[in-house]
Amino acid sequence: ALQGLREALQRNPTNKNLKEALDIAPEDHSSAYLSYYNLAKSGFEEPMTTHSDHYNSNYGYSIAAYSKGEVFMEQLGYIVGADTRDKILLEYYKQWRFKHPNANDFIRVAEDVSGIQLDWYKEYWVNTIKTIDYKIDSLWEENGVSKIRLKRIGHIPMPIDLQLTFKDGSTEMFYVPLNLMFGAKPNENN
């Protein structure tokens, strides 16, 4: 059950720190997202909590253990903010190095550091095969004010960062927190 998170924890800080030390561009996670997307569409996905010996296919296991774990960690940065995610990883290492943590221990550290409730994220991402999918449902103007309606298509709720681009080329970011979080990530647009 912990294999995917374990792989992500081992990979994320190591690659980030190495790339900073060597002055290399940040890691592109697109291959992990693509692998996960293909697995989700394939019908072979199983919850990450499935014991490694009990997966119905090697394909499902390998993507869950590596790519889906990497996506979990990258999305955690989206939920709590990338800087906060990095602080979570450092604190988790400090508290749990040379010990035997479980997935709940990681989430407890993440909640303590971020001040955000994260059980919902772990439950959906690790224990189910539900997906995240939103779309712009409609746009309209009301009393000179533009309105946007978003629609959740997938079954995993997420906070939303929505960037609007105006006719003059300027942009503005809007953040819609999720009520399950009982908090919000720091403003990352400064």
Segments from the language model and where they lie:
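Long, His/Glu/Asp-enriched segments that create or flank divalent metal/ion-associated functional microenvironments
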Residues: I132-N190
